[in-house]
Amino acid sequence: MNAPMQPVAHNPAGNKYVEETRFGFWFLQSHVWQHHVLRVAINDLKGLLGQPLPEGAVLLDAGCGQGKSFRLLQNAFAPAQLMGLDADPHSLTMSRAEAEREGLPVQLLSSDCASIQLGDASVDVIFCHQTFHHLVEQEAALAEFWRVLKPGGWLLFAESTQFYIDTWVIRWLFRHPMHVQRTAEEYLQMLRDQGFEFGPQNVSYPYLWWSRSSDFGLLERWKLVKPKAVGQRNETLVNAAVRKPL
């Protein structure tokens, strides 16, 4: 087997996160990412939230990457102000170009998630999609989310679990800090430990074809095996809409 793909550039945030490989950076521009991963997650999180944003809402995309989420977030939630945060300068350059292409006035922040350059209680909603499995300081990042969220604010959290990240195909094509990967329940417990509130109606466990690297769901599609229910399988993804109490 070949060695893992090499990272695309120097990591300006030091050891706080593990950046994408060249393949990963390309993949974040792909149709599969935009339509089968990002769009699906945003639609699911909107359902888990189950209510419109408050008037004049500020929405922060924490780990915005190349900005492919901006139009989807604007259409789904209609925030009054949309912000994007990323620690990678090249990604921010692409995010800026994407915002201009979409005609969206997105405020961009050059920062990692563990040290957000925003004031306390300044954001109504944080969207954090497929970012935490790159972060080394996960608890510190979550504490920053808590700090910048207003009381009653929401964190829309979508992550891949260790049962997806720790597979041969992902290890080959991508690069992650393996020692901090978590199960779905461990991610949810981390959110609880920070103080976020949520119920079963705010959580989903998507079992999407691309997250099952053993067969990519083909055996189920060909009806060679029966799909397993939640609780009978190793969850590969977890989505949650969690609230900072008033």
Question: What do the predicted segments below correspond to?
Answer:
Residues 1-53, 72:
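Conserved class I S-adenosyl-L-methionine
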Residues 161-177:
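Short, glycine-/aromatic-enriched active-site segment of Class I SAM-dependent methyltransferases
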Residues 180-195:
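Short alpha-helix
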